[in-house]
Amino acid sequence: MPTRPARSGLHSLAQLLRSDVVGGFLLIGGALTALIWANSPFGHVYEALRSFSFGPEALHLHLTVEAWVADGLLAIFFFVVGNELKQEFVHGELRNPRRAMLPIVAAVCGMAVPALIYAAFNAGDPARLPGWGIPMATDIAFAVAILAVVGRHLPSPLRTFLLTLAIVDDLGAIIVIAVFYTASLSFLPLIGAGMLLAVFGYLQRGRGVAARLNSAALPNWVVYLPLAGVIWALVHASGVHATIAGVAMGLLMRTVPLAGEKESPSHRLAHLLGPWSSGLVLPVFAVMSAGVVFAGGLGAVLDDTAALGIIAGLVVGKTVGIAGGSWVTTKLTAAELSPALRWIDITGMALLAGIGFTVSLLITDLSFPDYPEALVHAKAGVLLASLLATVLGAVVLAVRNAHYRKLRQAVSPQ
């Protein structure tokens, strides 16, 4: 048993890791470590680690370390995000359908405009045109981390807007992968996953059989952990990106405590998994995903229309699609922007949405299997666009953060 000082130390560490700012710095540190390592003389060690495979072959889970992190470990982060969104839909900003509609429409516009921009750059090149899906995706982990680091005083609805937008964006990108970039989709595992998700949702209700289960001597994790593992494995086997399993289970969590409960399962798991998500999952993910090698120099990258289309799509297309699409939507429909936000806030957030790593790099691999030069340049383009979007978004949001800090100090000078 841990001693009292040890327990106190672990509690303090957990509290520290629950901070989005601390998690953001850890993730950025992981990304910088990966970039330096991959482009150093020891880059072959980094690549060997990422490509090392393990897992049961019979279950089609003999995966590389990189895949285990991107598909498996990151599902924990997506569960935490889905769970947080569920709380917002039930108790928070997204209870208002007119406000919930706006980030959803923004996500759709933020996928369409970058794809069109990329297609315009590469319309005359059949070898590079298949990469139109690359600039569609927002890397939610990096975007939320940067927002946390630069925007401690920004209104909370901005983070909710970004979370909702990024989840819809990821879902859209995964549908694009399934329809346009996947040779075959296995529907039987997908149906099985859907049925088990229904069981998961039923158990969350805490009535009937679920109530008897909750009152049994067995701890809940004995049931939920294997169930979650099987759901994840089935989604993975279907060909759909397995992190969707995490989002789905997070959205099914019960956010209202039953009679006799001190807190709901949603709040309990948010408290438990938050430190693991920010302190372990995101930094490890950054180390495994951000190691892009700059081969051939920057000039060769910027001479390639695939890289230029990606950079323009992620930096310009995302901003125009999200901010412009949101503004037009508020003028033409009943959708409305939160009173706590201004359009410059949405513009800064839209710039951050131009950060593309995981899904963008995945689509890059699927787009150019027979064109290694385009593949290398496109990956470098994703990285350059993400760095540019980070800097521009951080500058805009840092200015807005200072503005909101002054407003709060004026209201409560102490």
UniProtKB/Swiss-Prot annotation:
Stored InterPro entries: Na/H_antiporter_dom_sf (IPR023171), NhaA (IPR004670)
Please tell me where this protein is predominantly located: membrane
**UniProt keyword annotation of Kinase present:** no
> Which GO molecular function entries does the Swiss-Prot or TrEMBL record give?
sodium:proton antiporter activity
**Record-linked Pfam families:** Na_H_antiport_1
Instruction: Provide one Gene Ontology cellular component.
Output: plasma membrane
Keywords assigned by UniProt, alphabetized: Antiport, Cell membrane, Ion transport, Membrane, Sodium, Sodium transport, Transmembrane, Transmembrane helix, Transport
Membrane topology qualifier: Multi-pass membrane protein
Can the keyword Transmembrane be found in this entry's annotation? Answer: yes
Annotated catalysed reactions: Na(+)(in) + 2 H(+)(out) = Na(+)(out) + 2 H(+)(in)
Positions of transmembrane segments: 22-42, 61-81, 101-121, 131-151, 171-191, 215-235, 239-259, 281-301, 308-328, 343-363, 379-399
Compartments (UniProt record): Cell membrane
One biological process term in Gene Ontology: regulation of pH
Function of the protein: Na(+)/H(+) antiporter that extrudes sodium in exchange for external protons.
Similarity comment text for this entry: Belongs to the NhaA Na(+)/H(+) (TC 2.A.33) antiporter family.
Q: Which NCBIfam families match?
A: NhaA (TIGR00773)
Q: What is this protein called?
A: Na(+)/H(+) antiporter NhaA
Recorded name of the encoding gene:
nhaA
